[in-house]
Swiss-Prot record:
This is NAD(P)H dehydrogenase (quinone). Its EC number is 1.6.5.2. One of its GO terms (cellular component) is membrane. It comes from Salmonella typhi. It is an enzyme of class 1 (oxidoreductase). Residues 4-189 form the Flavodoxin-like domain.
Amino acid sequence: MAKILVLYYSMYGHIETMAHAVAEGAKKVDGAEVIIKRVPETMPPEIFAKAGGKTQNAPVATPQELADYDAIIFGTPTRFGNMSGQMRTFLDQTGGLWASGALYGKLGGVFSSTGTGGGQEQTITSTWTTLAHHGMVIVPIGYSAQELFDVSQVRGGTPYGATTIAGGDGSRQPSQEELSIARYQGEYVAGLAVKLNG
């Protein structure tokens, strides 16, 4: 049995929705045990509420538990072409895992959201840097998801990982095509994890 963690941060719910789609895809794979968790919120509760943050029910992960999984698929909104501060704060607490090599050889993937489409690929590839320092095996999705060839509408999705475009005011929700790419990413990473660890 390969253990897959879908670990995310979401303020307004876009990445939370994508995380559930990633997990749904991963659960299609026989021999994959899939868990969804989120990183802790670092914003004071009153500021989070005032900013319109969405309450989420996923359990909160601890940095130490990352060593328990065979594959981790990270989801983060874009903040100036980088991962969110909450995800960065969480990953900055993994120094002990780095020192012991606890994540070496584990599979890692990334999905993201952007307000206007700017920075989604940069967010994924800049997150890969942290995964590389941990010795994780980075798993992009390439162009194997057919939805990536559809140019009939505005949509996220890259060969690096699933993405969604939330719009400048956050009103646009992930489209069916974006969710399909997210499900594909989950299934693809979980399938590799089962082949390697199952």
